[in-house]
């Protein structure tokens, strides 16, 4: 199998509290890794370390063989995208503008091309009728899928999902499961944080347990 991410001895603490220590993990293209642990144990912090938003106390992360500290941060966050629990959608923008703003600002894509790319994914995710809706007009499941689409538009090879099924009903959870399955089949690697262990067991081929002062366990 071909490695895309190597995490070596990753450790992070806040003050005297160790969140996680000596986490070792190798990820191949298309792997789906689940992270479970008690609330406040550092699962989201772990995700932020992986895409360079937070520096670990020690340890190393390699993306396609290169230390992430040596990769341009703008490029790194396109290669390793993150979907936060609260989705981080701009409430004053409609869906199509939420999806195209980064394409235009970061990738310098013109408006027509950006909108064509966004509409293509909206159709694929059965959300084309929502392109002019605002975030407060969307259901939780729709907001989640819009946030995933926005990340996909940047062309990531790794996607980090923070509690992707929180507050979703069974139907929307199943839709998220299908999305994860398809992304994995397309060789996109996923790291998923969730408090729902049954969901993690269903979607993941590797599981890490993170707790206060615990080592990561696969």
Residue ranges and their predicted role:
Residues 36-38:
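The feature captures the beta-strand-to-loop junction immediately N-terminal to the Walker
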Residues 133-136, 154-155, 186:
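Conserved signature/switch motifs of ABC ATPase nucleotide-binding domains
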Residues 194-195:
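H-loop/switch region of ABC-family ATPase nucleotide-binding domains
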Residues 59-67, 76:
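Conserved ABC transporter NBD signature motif
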Residues 159-162:
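Catalytic Walker B motif of ABC-type/P-loop ATPase nucleotide-binding domains
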């Amino acid at each position: 199998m071909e490695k895309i991410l190597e995490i070596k001895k990753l450790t992070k603490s806040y003050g005297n509290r160790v969140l996680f220590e000596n986490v070792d993990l190798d990820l191949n293209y298309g792997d789906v890794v689940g992270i479970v642990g008690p609330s406040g144990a550092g699962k989201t912090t772990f995700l932020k370390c992986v895409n360079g938003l937070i520096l670990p106390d020690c340890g190393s992360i390699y993306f396609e063989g290169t230390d992430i500290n040596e990769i341009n941060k703008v490029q790194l966050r396109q290669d390793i995208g993150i979907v936060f629990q609260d989705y981080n959608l701009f409430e004053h923008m409609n869906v199509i503008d939420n999806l195209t703003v980064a394409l235009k600002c970061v990738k310098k894509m013109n408006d027509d091309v950006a909108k064509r790319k966004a509409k293509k994914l909206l159709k694929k995710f059965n959300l084309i009728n929502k392109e002019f809706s605002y975030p407060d007009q969307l259901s939780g499941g729709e907001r989640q899928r819009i946030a995933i689409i926005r990340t996909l538009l940047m062309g990531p090879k790794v996607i980090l999902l923070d509690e992707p099924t929180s507050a979703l009903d069974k139907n929307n959870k199943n839709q998220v499961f299908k999305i994860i399955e398809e992304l994995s089949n397309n060789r996109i690697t996923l790291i998923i944080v969730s408090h729902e262990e049954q969901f993690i067991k269903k979607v993941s081929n590797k599981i890490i347990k993170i707790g206060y002062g615990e080592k990561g366990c696969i």
